């Protein structure tokens, strides 16, 4: 958001939350009313505040839920489906769905949002890849995307592939980190109403 060039036509924001690893609970977790209360407070600064406007604002939002993605590790190849895995050095990763036991407890991004995201990345020349978080019924994980999707907004998980996630030493590619930065900037620059 800080590197946005020019004046945005539409409102842009970056929301930082914690407690994701324990279910996004508490006053600063995404399961709280933090987001909707903040939007309501902003709307309250206008002359024509109403609850329906807050709900419409949330519904018409587009979000990249930024987290890391499991990078393919050849030493533990059985934990991945190679053709549905993120690889280091291939750019920012988009996870259409997360969860475990199939798609349980996840958000599943719609194809129209995926298409608009691909266009934004292609137009900006950003290297990107799509993946899932490990082999079905073996891997998996959760993020905050499903908590924001409950408002009807378009949400997808995005982030940098990482090897040895949650280990004392994690490994990422500097290329992916840079493409992630470029991807987030392109997403903000390409902000437009949901069609």
Predicted regions, residues:
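Noncatalytic linker/hinge segments flanking ATPase motor cores
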Residues: 53-62, 102-113, 169-175, 195
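Short alpha-helical interface elements
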Residues: 39, 142-146, 153, 172-173, ...
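Active-site-adjacent substrate-binding region
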Residues: 69-76, 80-169
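Conserved active-site and cofactor/substrate-binding residues in soluble primary-metabolism enzymes
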Residues: 30-38, 108-116, 139-142, 175-182
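Acidic/histidine-rich catalytic neighborhood of metal-dependent amide-processing enzymes
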Residues: 1-93, 140, 189-195
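His/Asp/Glu-rich mid-to-C-terminal helical/loop segments that flank catalytic regions of hydrolases
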Residues: 2-13, 160-195
């Amino acid at each position: 958001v800080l590197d946005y060039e020019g004046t945005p036509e539409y409102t842009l924001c970056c929301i930082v939350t914690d407690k994701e690893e324990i279910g996004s609970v508490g006053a600063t977790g995404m399961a709280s009313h933090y987001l909707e209360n903040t939007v309501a407070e902003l709307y309250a600064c206008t002359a024509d505040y109403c609850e329906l406007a807050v709900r419409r604002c949330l519904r018409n939002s587009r979000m990249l839920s930024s987290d890391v993605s499991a990078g393919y590790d050849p030493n533990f190849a059985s934990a991945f489906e190679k053709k549905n895995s993120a690889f280091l050095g291939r750019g920012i990763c988009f996870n259409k769905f997360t969860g475990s036991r199939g798609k349980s407890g996840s958000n599943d991004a719609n194809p129209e949002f995926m298409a608009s995201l691909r266009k934004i990345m292609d137009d900006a020349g950003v290297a990107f890849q799509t993946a899932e978080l490990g082999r079905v019924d073996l891997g998996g994980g959760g993020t905050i995307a499903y908590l924001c999707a409950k408002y009807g907004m378009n949400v997808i998980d995005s982030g940098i592939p990482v090897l040895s996630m949650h280990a004392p030493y994690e490994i990422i590619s500097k290329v992916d980190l840079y493409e992630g930065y470029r991807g987030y900037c392109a997403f903000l620059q390409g902000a437009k109403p949901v069609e």
